[in-house]
A protein has these predicted regions:
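Helix-boundary capping/turn motifs
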Residues: 91, 110, 294-295
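Short active-site segment of divalent metal-dependent hydrolases/proteases
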Residues: 102-110, 217
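Short pre-active-site segment immediately N-terminal to the catalytic Zn-binding motif
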Residues: 83-95
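Histidine-centered, transition-metal-coordinating active-site segments
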Residues: 1-72, 77-85, 133-139, 143-423
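Active/ligand-binding-proximal structured segments within catalytic/core domains
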Residues: 72-77, 92, 98, 114-118
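Post-HEXXH active-site segment of zinc metalloproteases
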Residues: 98, 108-133, 228-235
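Short alpha-helical catalytic segment bearing the HExxH-like zincin motif
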Residues: 96-101, 211
């Protein structure tokens, strides 16, 4: 029902409001007409991690096809879906848009395979049963809190310093857990105490909407992109018709011709309308039983016919080799880092040497070797950033390397890999 969530929206009347707009550090003030969440939206929009999403994988790796979805287009789809839902239900669409825009800024190159690869590198010392160390939801929060910066009015690079509600939405956005009746949790918490993706619900209804919107946005679009690459054969198309017929009580041939389950715009519209019709503050965010079953079956279809297709599996071998080679190369610089000579150690890899040393300067206690000894260039480069990595601790240095790689685009990772293996 329209505006049925108006009384639970995150605004000045909400009992959660003061916590929702809280920032770790009071942000600098100037003549501004934006709300707190609009300000977060534009801070994310202008940060480098968001800009790099245009060259990060959504499903199809390092695509050169202008019409295939990248990670940046995906987050815009999520923002659009979340905004539409919030506007109809009476929720704060500006909060949802800010969360959606930033929800993947910590995503690894090469999509979820890249994420799994970086996680395996961090887990290799602890064995296969170790808790997951690298997951992009937490990494998006980490990037927002400690990595990404913007210049203030004096030209000093300052942290993004986002509101609690947006930060919470980043780490709690996991859309991979199939749930009905999603409701926000009651209490604020230390967001870094969350140990696994999908276990904790967001603090706001708007965060819950983004969590659902993430799933709505990718299901149909992934099928559309698979069609661009002729990934789906006739048997797959028949399977889609069968899914529509068995779950939505529609004739398969008619549903297929009308574009259902293939045309992303039709699919997104149908799922949004069903969610808005079925949801209430009492029931939570939910779909009808028919559409929920349809979502589950379509997700199974995507896994079987798209994500596990041999063409994508072949590329994952290359992607793993690429990320592992960069990781090993950077870990070999550890002794050089202690002496301020990382750029020299990587001098044969011009795209890697300067960017990695600058990363160390900005985010660690690394000091550069000069004619006057070791110097800290943070002030020279106007970085007001915390040294979140300690280069004197090898484990912290390893974490630093992993985070640096996670920020790479597909294209930059491939370029660096090429430098390393060429003679």
């Amino acid at each position: 029902m329209k505006n049925s969530f108006f009384d639970v929206r995150c605004d000045e009347k909400s009992e959660k409001w003061e916590m929702a707009i809280k920032r770790e550090i009071p942000i600098y003030l100037r003549n501004d007409i934006r709300s707190e969440f609009e300000r977060d939206y534009t801070r994310i929009l202008h940060c480098d991690a968001y800009r790099r999403l245009k060259h990060k994988t959504q499903v199809f790796y390092a695509t050169k096809n202008d019409h295939v979805c990248t990670r940046m287009e995906h987050v815009m789809h999520v923002a659009s879906v979340a905004s539409t839902i919030c506007k109809f239900l009476g929720l704060n669409e500006k909060l949802a848009e800010a969360i959606a825009l930033g929800h993947d800024i910590g995503h690894a190159p090469f999509g979820h395979h890249g994420e799994d690869c970086l996680n395996s590198l961090m887990e290799q010392k602890e064995g296969a049963n170790a808790p997951k160390k690298f997951w992009h939801e937490r990494n998006s929060l980490f990037f927002a809190d400690y990595i990404e910066t913007l210049p203030d009015p004096d030209g000093i690079q300052q942290p993004l310093n986002l509101t609690y509600a947006v930060r919470d939405g980043l780490i709690c956005h996991c859309g991979e857990i199939d749930q009905q009746g999603i409701k926000p949790r009651t209490d604020a918490m230390d967001l870094y105490s969350i140990k696994r993706p999908g276990l904790i619900q967001p603090f706001t209804w708007e965060g819950c909407v983004v969590k659902v919107a993430d799933k709505i946005a990718y299901l149909g679009r992934d099928i559309e992109d698979a069609r661009q690459y002729h990934i789906l054969d006739m048997a797959a198309y028949r399977h889609i018709r069968e899914i529509v017929a068995s779950t939505l009580n529609a004739k398969g041939s008619h549903a297929f011709r009308s574009g259902k389950a293939v045309n992303t715009t039709v699919l997104i519209n149908d799922l949004i309308v069903d969610l808005c019709e079925q949801s209430s503050p009492e029931k939570g965010l939910c779909f009808s039983d028919e559409y929920f079953k349809f979502i589950l079956e379509l997700k199974k279809f995507n896994i079987a016919h798209i994500y596990n297709h041999w063409r994508l599996r072949e590329f994952t071998v290359y992607a793993s080799n690429c990320l592992q080679t960069i990781y090993r190369t950077l870990m070999r610089t550890y002794d050089y880092a202690l002496n301020g000579r990382v750029e020299r150690a990587l001098r044969y890899y011009p795209n890697l040497s300067g960017t990695f040393e600058n990363w160390l300067i900005k985010h660690s206690n690394y000091k550069v070797l000069s004619s006057n000894g070791l110097i800290d260039k943070k002030k020279v480069l106007r970085y007001n950033t915390e040294a979140v990595f300690n280069i004197e601790d090898r484990e912290s240095y390893e974490k630093c390397v992993i985070e640096f790689i996670s920020g790479m685009t597909d294209s930059f990772a491939m370029q660096v890999f090429g430098e390393i293996i060429e003679f």
